[in-house]
Curated annotation (Swiss-Prot):
Gene name as annotated: rsmA
Family statement: Belongs to the class I-like SAM-binding methyltransferase superfamily. rRNA adenine N(6)-methyltransferase family. RsmA subfamily.
Organism the protein comes from: Staphylococcus haemolyticus (strain JCSC1435)
Compartment annotation: Cytoplasm
Entry-linked SUPFAM superfamilies: S-adenosyl-L-methionine-dependent methyltransferases (SSF53335)
Listed name of the protein: Ribosomal RNA small subunit methyltransferase A
CDD domains: AdoMet_MTases
Listed EC numbers: 2.1.1.182
Gene Ontology CC annotation, any one: cytosol
Function per UniProt: Specifically dimethylates two adjacent adenosines (A1518 and A1519) in the loop of a conserved hairpin near the 3'-end of 16S rRNA in the 30S particle. May play a critical role in biogenesis of 30S subunits.
């Protein structure tokens, strides 16, 4: 007898009943129950039988199942121990799936990739990300030395819009800068609340992030560069001059240096962080090397 797709309301409900599973709000559990949405996610990821997949938060395996049919291998991180027996049953037909019962933020992802996906030509992150930790997960993956080619991920609409936001818009901020520094970003589709069980309180969006061959700008210390950019958005309604006076050690004392630094970079101190492009921040970063008194 042919197995029914996991991503239907009836099959998901049957599994919930079979395993006596109750959703944990603290883990942001909202299971996808529309296989058409899943196919659109997978189509956008352009995976083939040489692709290795990193998935985060497989839930009951609705996306995992469809990924396993098209990818070479799927490696899924699931933090909730209660879902492991469910996944062992739902994904039993697929010997190309590895479930890792760990917190993705604490796991040695590089080691796991070498262990399970070393023979894959391409590696993609494809996931319905837990909404409460979407940003930490993405930043953690992007900033590690892992050969990831791209990401097709579902997340809260508001967060997705920030990833793809253009300079000068309300959604543009430090998260936009980090993601666009590493990747080319685009929107795939908006997802209604009705395709989840239980329905989330927020609208959802699928975003595609393809790794750049080289970062958008060249800096020699990414961590310091990102801190400098983030500081400009500390209080969005304040000018970059005010934000940097609060950011640097003894910033008030060095306010003349801050003004000179901004002016020598060709940036009006009265501007707000949201008006500065990634290239502007790269110029600020380079020029700051001439002002050793500006420390944080």
């Amino acid at each position: 007898m042919e197995r029914k797709d996991i991503a239907t309301p009836s099959r998901t409900k049957a599994l919930l009943d079979q395993f006596g599973f109750n959703f944990k709000k603290s883990l942001g559990q909202n299971f996808l129950v529309d296989v058409n949405i899943i196919h659109k996610i997978i189509d956008a990821s352009e995976i083939d039988d040489n692709t290795g997949i990193i998935e985060v938060g497989p839930g009951m395996g609705s996306l995992t199942e469809q990924l396993a049919k098209r990818a070479k291998k799927v490696m899924s991180f699931e933090i909730d121990q209660r879902l492991i027996p469910v996944l062992k049953e739902t994904l039993a037909p697929y010997d190309n799936v590895t479930i890792i019962n760990e917190d993705i933020l604490k796991a040695d992802i590089g080691k796991a990739v070498k262990t399970y996906l070393n023979d894959c030509d391409k590696i993609m992150v494809v996931a319905n990300l837990p909404y409460y930790i979407t940003t930490p997960i993405l930043l953690n993956l992007m900033q590690q030395d892992i050969p990831i080619d791209g990401y097709v991920v579902m997340m809260q609409k508001e967060v997705g819009e920030r990833l793809n936001a253009q300079v000068g818009t309300k959604a543009y901020g430090s998260l936009s800068i980090v993601t666009q520094y590493y990747t080319e970003t685009s929107k795939v589709l908006t997802v209604p609340k009705s395709v989840f069980m239980p329905p989330p309180n927020v609208d959802s969006i699928v975003v595609k992030l393809m790794q750049r061959e080289t970062p958008l700008v060249s800096v020699d210390d990414e961590e310091t560069f990102f801190k400098l950019a983030k500081a400009a958005f500390a209080q969005r309604r304040k000018t970059i001059n005010n934000n940097y006076q609060n950011f640097f050690k003894d910033g008030k004392k060095h306010k003349e240096s801050i003004l000179k630094w901004l002016e020598q970079t060709g940036i009006d101190p009265k501007r707000r962080g949201e008006t500065l492009s990634i290239q502007d921040f790269a110029r600020l970063y380079e020029e700051k090397k001439n002002f050793p008194e500006l420390e944080n």
